[in-house]
């Protein structure tokens, strides 16, 4: 609910700008046909609702994405395509959804017809269960980059393990993202983008997707930099029965269920009598996504995702590209939506709880819930960020860590720090919903992100110099009222939480 409210604030605040856009047509010829979009009031050309793969509905449910067929005539790219199906309890009633949903969007400066501008490919979050590619991409495009966003299959339509599937692929949503990158490689030049300078970036599940693409062989060479914002790649994922290595312990220290058993539980809730694929492909897709409890998890299937990203990073299996990652000061704000209670997570901490309470004394002094939520957020997101950034040394690639520490009193007065996904609002937000100090910080953050996409280094001459993170000790760029780089920040806390993670894996490996 919090993520939905944050996104509604963002989209409603920007609606008047989008409505004021001019209707000047802008045409482009892609590999499959002609499209026409619009040039808006900011001087940005936008193309919305471009199909990057054929419909995955009906008999193509739980199949890899298929290439787009050639189009005849001129196709309108003025409106977003439908979002992928998602639970009714979480989606806005105004959101148009359909199982036929594999569409992407492009924003590019109007002057960039023959240029080769950096390309920034945004992957939305939403727990792999909600969300879509509707963003105000013109906000970043005005900085001289080409922005791409896309929909990808969600919930059990995007992540499904079933014993009768002929392939060992379970992450169809991840394959959708690879297909979108294929489309970028083939077509982005006609929009003024450089196919040899593509940056992935995404928040939350989108950040996790970035990390998964970093270790996906099918995505190799299709992007050249990556920014994972609040990715959570250290937590255990369900495994298929034929995936290598046994299933690790889950977050509450119980043996994780197999991916097949989790998938069958969802399927039985949607259609109790179906045990084979043909009838399941005929079940209304909305029933399937409505049957998911909590978030959707990607699946370790030995193919599209060989193992948890953190384990692969530590073994040097990730792409050798410049990498930025980090999170916010109160990531634990997302805990109520995670499906893990305060008491359950406290039990997971076990004998370390007293040490952790001492390290987080100021948070526990406010309340036990605030203390546990802060620890949860740091464990889930910041431990992952530091571990993956440090592991980039195994492939001799540079990495940078960031930490947003703003108290957005004007927007969310009851937050004790910067909430989960607030950096998305900073990247794409509006002056009317954040105060002047936060607006200035947001503009600086955008400039660092764009420069990283342009050059592979987040260095802006007139702003604070940002050193790589892990040569001698942790170096975090802290975005606040005044930005600064801090060495060893959070090390005492993250060292303890990382040790817990290592013990959890050592019990089963």
Task: Give residue spans per PLM region.
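Bacterial N-terminal signal peptides
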Residues: 5-16
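Substrate-gating cap/lid region and adjacent catalytic-acid/histidine neighborhood
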Residues: 238, 273-439, 448, 455
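Non-catalytic accessory segments of hydrolases
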Residues: 20-171, 195, 435-448, 454-465, ...
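Short, solvent-exposed turn/loop segments enriched in Gly/Ser/Thr/Pro and often Arg
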Residues: 153-155, 201-205, 403-410, 464-470
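Polar, surface-exposed loop/tail segments
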Residues: 283-285, 407, 456-483
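Short glycine-biased active-site loop of nucleotidyltransferases that positions the nucleotide triphosphate
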Residues: 139-141, 215-219, 413-419, 468-469
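Serine-hydrolase-like catalytic core of hydrolytic proteins
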Residues: 86-274, 312-335, 397, 456, ...
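Substrate-binding rim/cap in mid-to-C-terminal beta-strand-loop elements of soluble/periplasmic
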Residues: 158, 224-225, 232-234, 420-435, ...
């Amino acid at each position: 609910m919090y993520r939905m409210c944050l996104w509604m604030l963002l989209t409603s605040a920007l609606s008047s700008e989008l409505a004021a856009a001019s209707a000047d047509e802008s045409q482009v010829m892609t590999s499959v046909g002609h499209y026409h979009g619009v040039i808006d009031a900011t001087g940005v050309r936008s193309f919305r609702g471009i199909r990057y793969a054929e419909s995955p509905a009906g008999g193509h449910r739980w199949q890899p994405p298929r290439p787009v067929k050639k189009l005849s005539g001129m196709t309108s790219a003025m409106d977003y395509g439908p979002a992928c199906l998602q639970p009714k309890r979480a989606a806005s009633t105004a959101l148009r959804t359909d199982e036929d949903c594999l569409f992407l969007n492009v924003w590019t400066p109007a002057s960039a017809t023959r240029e080769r501008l950096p390309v920034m490919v945004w992957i939305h979050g939403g727990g792999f269960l909600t969300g879509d590619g509707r963003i105000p991409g013109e906000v970043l495009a005005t900085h001289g980059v080409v922005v791409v966003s896309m929909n990808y299959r969600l919930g059990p339509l995007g992540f499904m393990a079933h014993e009768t599937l002929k392939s060992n692929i379970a992450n169809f949503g991840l394959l959708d993202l690879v297909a979108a990158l294929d489309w970028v490689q083939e077509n982005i030049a006609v929009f003024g983008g450089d196919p040899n300078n593509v940056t992935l970036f995404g928040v939350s599940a989108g950040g996790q997707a970035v990390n998964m693409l970093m270790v996906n062989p099918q995505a190799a060479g299709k992007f050249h930099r990556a920014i994972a914002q609040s990715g959570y790649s250290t937590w255990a994922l369900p495994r298929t029965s034929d995936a290598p290595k046994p299933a690790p312990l889950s977050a509450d220290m119980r043996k994780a269920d197999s991916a097949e058993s989790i998938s069958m539980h969802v399927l039985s809730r949607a259609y109790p009598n179906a045990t084979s694929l043909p009838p399941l492909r005929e079940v209304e897709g909305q029933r399937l996504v409505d049957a998911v409890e909590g978030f959707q998890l990607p699946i370790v299937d030995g193919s599209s995702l060989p193992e948890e990203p953190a384990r692969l990073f530590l073994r040097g299996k990730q792409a050798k590209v410049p990498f930025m990652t980090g999170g916010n000061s109160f990531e634990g704000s997302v805990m109520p939506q995670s499906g893990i209670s305060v008491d359950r997570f406290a039990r997971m901490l076990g004998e370390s709880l007293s040490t952790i309470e001492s390290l987080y004394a100021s948070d526990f002094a406010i309340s036990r819930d605030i203390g546990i939520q802060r620890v949860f957020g740091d464990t889930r997101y910041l431990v992952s960020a530091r571990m993956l950034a440090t592991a980039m040394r195994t492939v001799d690639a540079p990495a940078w860590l960031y930490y947003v520490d703003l108290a957005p009193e004007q927007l969310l007065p009851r937050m004790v720090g910067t909430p989960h996904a607030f950096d998305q609002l900073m990247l794409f937000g509006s002056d009317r919903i954040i105060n002047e100090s936060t607006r200035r910080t947001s503009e600086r953050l955008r400039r660092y992100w764009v420069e990283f996409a342009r050059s592979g280094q987040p260095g802006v001459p007139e702003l604070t110099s940002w050193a790589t993170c892990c040569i001698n000790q942790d170096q975090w760029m802290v975005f606040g009222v005044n930005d600064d780089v801090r060495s060893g920040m959070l090390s005492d806390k993250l060292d303890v939480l990382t040790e817990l993670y290592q013990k959890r894996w050592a019990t089963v490996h």
